[in-house]
């Protein structure tokens, strides 16, 4: 786990005192989680009953991801191959399609988090945007995530011959980066459809006004300077 020892709660506590459990060793927490996932993979349906429901592909993907994080590479590979063997998923030939209405049923999507507009109309949007566009910037890209994107030639940014330029870190990168992360210098259509250049680098804008998108702005601006 990310946090080491943790509480294992595999029952519904009847009282607050019932929930006061000691932390278990990290190894036991991992074993417990993996046993639950392995059992689920054996008993869950191969296809979801409806969109947004968990099925075998989701469980196997979680097994693969957990083992990858824990350094169990052979187990991660085995689970990933089982996902492929289901013959339900494939990479979308158009990356942007997955972020459009027509891409809601893309075969690249293994599990969906469904949005019901009538019950929670703007919750997700609010979390992702800066306050200047009506958001809270609660969930923003980290520098670690951005650094994981390769160069256009497939090399990692710290790999010899990659051509990575720290002064221009977004130049000649995997095109999916630009389609995933909003960073300074990009054309941006903000609140009420007003276009501007997204700028989180300048604390003060031309004319002397305060830049609400500046990364240290207290007004719910992204603290990584990216959305």
Residue ranges and their predicted role:
Residues 30, 34, 38-41, 56-208:
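An aromatic- and glycine-enriched ligand-binding surface/loop that stacks and positions planar moieties
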Residues 1-54, 70-75, 220-227:
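Aromatic-anchored glycine-rich loop motif in surface-exposed flexible loops
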């Amino acid at each position: 786990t990310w946090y080491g020892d943790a509480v294992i709660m595999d029952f519904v506590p009847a009282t607050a005192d019932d929930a006061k459990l000691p932390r278990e060793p990290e190894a036991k927490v991992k074993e417990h989680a993996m046993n639950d996932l392995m059992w689920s993979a054996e008993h869950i349906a191969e296809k979801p009953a409806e969109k947004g429901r968990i099925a075998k592909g989701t469980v196997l993907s979680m097994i693969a991801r957990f083992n990858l994080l824990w350094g169990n590479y052979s187990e991660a590979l085995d689970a990933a191959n089982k996902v492929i063997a289901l013959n339900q998923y494939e990479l979308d030939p158009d990356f942007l399609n997955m972020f459009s209405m027509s891409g809601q049923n893309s075969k690249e999507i293994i599990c969906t988090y469904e949005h019901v507009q009538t019950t929670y109309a703007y919750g997700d949007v609010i979390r992702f945007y800066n306050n200047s566009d009506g958001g809270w910037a609660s969930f923003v890209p980290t520098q670690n995530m951005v650094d994981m994107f390769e160069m256009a030639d497939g090399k990692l940014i710290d790999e010899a011959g990659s051509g990575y330029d720290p002064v221009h870190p977004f130049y000649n990168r995997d095109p999916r980066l630009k389609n995933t992360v909003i960073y300074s210098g990009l054309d941006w259509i903000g609140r009420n459809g007003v276009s501007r250049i997204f700028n989180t680098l300048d604390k003060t804008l031309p004319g002397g006004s305060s830049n609400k998108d500046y990364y240290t702005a207290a007004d719910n601006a992204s603290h990584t300077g990216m959305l």
